[in-house]
Amino acid sequence: MAAPSGVPPLRVLEELGIGLSPTGEVTEAVTSEGAYYLEQVTITETSEDECEYEEIPDDNFSIPEGEEDLEKAIHIIGEQARDIHILEQQTILPARNVMQEAIEDFLCNFLIKMGMTRTLDCFQAEWYELIQKKGSDFKGLGNVPDVYSQVMLLETENKNLKKELKHFKQAAEKAKEDLLRTQKERDFHRMHHKRIVQEKNKLIADLKGLKLHYASYEPTIRVLHEKHHALLKEKMLTSLERDRAVGKISGLQATLKNIDMGHIQVPVIKGSYESASITRESGDRAGHSCEKENSSEGPTQKSLREAREEVGYKSKLKNEKKDSEFPVDMQPDPNVTSCTENVSAAKFDYKLNNIFRLHELPVSCIVMHPCRDYLISCSEDRLWKMVGLPQGNVLLTGSGHTDWLSGCCFHPSGSKLATSSGDSTIKLWDLNKGECTLTLEGHNHAVWSCTWHSCGDFVASASLDMTSKIWDVNSERCRYTLYGHTDSVNSIEFFPFSNILLTASADKTLSVWDARTGKCEQSLYGHMHSVNDATFTPRGHIIASCDARGVTKLWDFRKLIPIVSIDVGPSSGNEVNFDQSGRVLAQASANGIIHLLDLKSGQIHKLVGHESEVHSVVFSHLGENLYSGGSDGTIRLWI
């Protein structure tokens, strides 16, 4: 490498770590990068034929003009090669050791900086005197540390400490959360353990009580077993006596039949029993001789005559009253349905307008007259009342049931009324006369609901005895008893203008029946609680039902599958009714609220005005008014 211009060669050698001895010889200088040597080379002259020449590009070096000789060219090439070799190697710079400033130098520099020359002179004089006197005692005083380095070290240490502090805080928070969670789990398991122990102790106590209870039943069971055997013996004896009595009755009936036909002559008693003679006639009734007018009628003859008269009377009544026939093809009566032709649009913004206080006890059912603006209300006070609308004037009051009334239904013509009661009867009333015309008996428990067939010849009833009955109004007898429900039948309704019946039961099911055969055609499952009421839309394509948990379900009557379920509970839904358009469904709830469901949009509107339970709800003919009956004995008008 060529030395820069203006720099002495010795200086360049010193920078490279190479020096010369006083005699001019080259000396070796060892640096951190290694040893460098300077050798003297003598180039001998050789023939040009023996040398191999290498072309050197002109761009790599430059020789000033006038100094172009072989020695300089070789020197420059060698320097260039060394430079390339040095650049290819990884240069390791020596570590820089910064010497800290001595204390006395720091003080001197501080005094000079502040311009305190006199103080500096005094300090230096006194300091050097001390050094001369004590010598090496001041060598261990140390140096002044570098403030900036110390600050950086402290800052770095501070940052590290802050990071560690943050890490420890996070770990502490996590440990705290784990501790709280563990404590909660411990408390939960402790409480659960205590509860299990209490339940265990309770079950042990109950088990001991049951063992004692069942032990006390053993003597009773033994006594009942003995009674059972005794009753079986009595039953066998009773069966024998019954068979004997049936034989006697059969003989008496045969005797009566023969007497009626004139084949047997009634004996005339003369004196003792042995003198009585029975003469069999072979002719007709004209040859029958009997001295009845000359002898007194005995008790046996009197009983036979009364039995014959009773049987004849019943057979005569039976022949006079014939059973009605179920219609085969029915169409809506235009005279009955004419009042519902002009139905207004659906309405939801009803407001409480009037309160009719009609009964002293809760209202159980309200129904609208098929055509007129009349309303019938039934109550637990054993009365039903006909009310004129919209004034609420009582037009007619009916009494005759011996227990609370549960429901009522108008005859399709509107001239008759059927009522069901807790006295297990159904009564038919003539509204023109205001009196009961027929009482239907046959249920074993309270009757919850009744409904008229569209032809007006049949009435169906639902009872607590888990059965429903179809009554023939003309023959005044039960045509069919519908068995199938496993709990109380709460509601019953005829499908409009058909022979199909719909029942709702406390066994959480709905059933569809054929009234002509009395058989169940289909059962609908879906409710989780007792079904209180079920009804059809005016068109008859949808069934609505509500249960004791406030759940209302809509069913497709054609497919007999559920469409939608609306939960407005947990209060019980007591009754559901459609308006004449079939778009609005009203539900009477036990919490005093009337829920109106829009079947088109699915929205639910609430009517609040009752102070207690709502038992029944019904729309007016055109849907402009709504009537509701509550447990406070009132009927409320909503317009």
Curated annotation (Swiss-Prot):
Expressed in testis. InterPro entries: G-protein_beta_WD-40_rep, WD-F-box_domain-protein, WD40/YVTN_repeat-like_dom_sf, WD40_repeat_CS, WD40_repeat_dom_sf, WD40_rpt. Residues 281-295, 303-325 have a biased composition (Basic and acidic residues). It holds the Pfam family WD40. Phosphorylated by TSSK2. It comes from the Eukaryota. One of its GO terms (cellular component) is cytoplasm. One of its GO terms (biological process) is cilium movement involved in cell motility. Residues 280-333 are annotated as: Disordered. GO terms for molecular function: protein kinase binding. Keywords: Cell projection, Cilium, Cilium biogenesis/degradation, Coiled coil, Cytoplasm, Cytoskeleton, Flagellum, Phosphoprotein, Repeat, WD repeat. Residues 146-218 form a coiled coil. It is found in: Cytoplasm; Cytoplasm, Cytoskeleton, Cilium axoneme; Cytoplasm, Cytoskeleton, Flagellum axoneme; Cell projection, Cilium, Flagellum. WD repeats lie at residues 358-397, 400-439, 442-481, 484-523, 526-565, 568-608, 609-639. Interacts with SPAG6 and STK36. Necessary for sperm flagellar function. Plays a role in motile ciliogenesis. May help to recruit STK36 to the cilium or apical surface of the cell to initiate subsequent steps of construction of the central pair apparatus of motile cilia. This is Sperm-associated antigen 16 protein. It comes from Mus musculus. The gene is Spag16.
